[in-house]
Amino acid sequence: MSSKRIIVTAGEPAGIGPDLVLALSAQDWPHQLVVCADKALLAQRATQLGIQVKLLDYQRDNPVQAQQAGTLLVEHIPLAEPVVAGQLNPANGHYVLKTLERAAKGCMNGEFDAIVTGPVHKGVINRAGVAFSGHTEFFAEQSKTPLVVMMLATEGLRTALVTTHLPLAEVPQAITCERLEQIVHILHKDLVEKFAIAEPKIYVCGLNPHAGEDGVLGMDEIETITPTLQRLREQYGMQLVGPLPADTIFSEKYLQQADAVLGMYHDQVLPVLKYKGFGRSVNITLGLPFIRTSVDHGTALDLAGTGQADAGSFWTALAYAIELVDKKAQ
């Protein structure tokens, strides 16, 4: 199998993102990795961390080759101002967005086969005068994708969400038949096309305690979730199990058979995922016209430049991207 190109964005320059991408130089990789960041920032952070790495300028027209240990290809995006590890600077907010724009455009024009994103700081980007709610929404806008699905995965568990960063009080009204149907279609399609699962089995959480208990604890299951799932089963032959109570859906007897668990809201499924795989889980954006994976943690400003950052989630994100790229090439 020929090598592909994966672009890696370093995220917030004052956080641990630069530390994480520099750590990638410690080993060989089967595909070519292109780090999208300020080259001088990487050189400075490498010196701070005592990492010996050769930073090479990325040339699009050069042959695609597997990544060699001790080197990193860099697509240079200049910072607005110098960076001090651990100290946020709104002046560099636009720099972060430029790295994401470059990565998205490169994937959409076929230059890159996947994006792996380091952690960003939403607050400092907004303080720079840019309305930014996260990578997921940004890439959806860049690719003109009307609806995307957030998946978080770790070994033995894939979860996806019907609603994401929404106040809990607003969740019930956001779960409509139309939205649930769209989310299930995207999840099912990407499990087939990106994960190469021919007939995925999706387990679906109810919204209310005990999945509503026949309407005693809420009518959302009866009025919205159950009829939508039944319609999808009948029309498309999808294997959809549920709605099941969220307090039992994560039992081993279900997880052994589930290709993915669909939760209704953020904190319904993510505590289980992070308990099961903290530091080894990955965020995958479904529905985009390209592969995008990311760490499941923040910028950890207090660890930047210290050598104490845990690269587990970042390496897992890259491993998932490589797996999905390889499956796409088959």
Curated annotation (Swiss-Prot):
Annotated binding of a divalent metal cation, by residue: 165, 210, 266
Cofactor note: Binds 1 divalent metal cation per subunit. Can use ions such as Zn(2+), Mg(2+) or Co(2+).
Protein name: 4-hydroxythreonine-4-phosphate dehydrogenase
EC number, UniProt record: 1.1.1.262
Keywords for this protein: Cobalt, Cytoplasm, Magnesium, Metal-binding, NAD, NADP, Oxidoreductase, Pyridoxine biosynthesis, Zinc
Record InterPro entries: PdxA, PdxA_fam
The protein's annotated pathway: Cofactor biosynthesis; pyridoxine 5'-phosphate biosynthesis; pyridoxine 5'-phosphate from D-erythrose 4-phosphate: step 4/5
Location within or outside the cell: Cytoplasm
Organism per entry: Vibrio cholerae serotype O1 (strain ATCC 39315 / El Tor Inaba N16961)
UniProt family annotation: Belongs to the PdxA family.
Source taxonomy: Bacteria, Pseudomonadati, Pseudomonadota, Gammaproteobacteria, Vibrionales
Gene assigned in the entry: pdxA
Gene3D superfamilies for this protein: Isopropylmalate Dehydrogenase
Primary residence: cytoplasm
Reaction it catalyzes: 4-(phosphooxy)-L-threonine + NAD(+) = 3-amino-2-oxopropyl phosphate + CO2 + NADH
Role of this protein: Catalyzes the NAD(P)-dependent oxidation of 4-(phosphooxy)-L-threonine (HTP) into 2-amino-3-oxo-4-(phosphooxy)butyric acid which spontaneously decarboxylates to form 3-amino-2-oxopropyl phosphate (AHAP).
Miscellaneous comment as given in the Swiss-Prot or TrEMBL entry: The active site is located at the dimer interface.
GO molecular function: 4-hydroxythreonine-4-phosphate dehydrogenase activity; cobalt ion binding; magnesium ion binding; NAD binding; zinc ion binding
